[in-house]
A protein has these predicted regions:
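Short glycine/proline-centered loop/turn elements that form peptide/ligand docking sites
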Residues: 83
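Short cysteine clusters
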Residues: 47, 66-69
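Short Gly/Pro-enriched loop/turn and capping motifs at secondary-structure junctions
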Residues: 72
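N-terminal pre-ligand scaffold of iron-sulfur
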Residues: 1-61, 75, 79, 87-105
């Protein structure tokens, strides 16, 4: 992929440390998770079980907890790690450049 395939989806300052926010990119709901200041992750924004918005969810350690049925996903891999979820989330390459969180899609 070329350098041009990266594009910004939000300002870094919009994502609180050890928390997440929801964003929309080209019609897709995504979440951005910020851990320990410089670790950022971008994942699909809907739970694979009950379709709840994960933007309303919680960061618990290195996991995302769904607000609807308390299923959990691994922040780094998107893997489903606590029932009732059994299907993982899609993940996207991300980086921080010039104060913005960028993804490659």
């Amino acid at each position: 992929m070329t350098e041009d395939s990266w594009h910004p989806i939000c300002e870094l300052g919009a994502v609180p440390e050890h928390d997440l926010i929801g964003v929309e990119d080209d019609g897709c709901e995504l979440i951005i998770v910020r851990l320990d200041g410089d670790r950022h992750f971008v994942l699909d924004g809907r739970c694979t079980h009950g379709k709840a918005s994960l933007a309303e969810g919680f960061v618990v350690g290195d996991e995302i907890e769904c607000p609807k049925h308390n299923g959990r996903f691994d922040v780094a891999t998107g893997d489903a790690i606590a029932r009732p979820v059994t299907v993982g989330l899609g993940t996207y390459q991300c980086r921080v450049r010039d104060g913005k969180v960028e993804i490659r899609r």
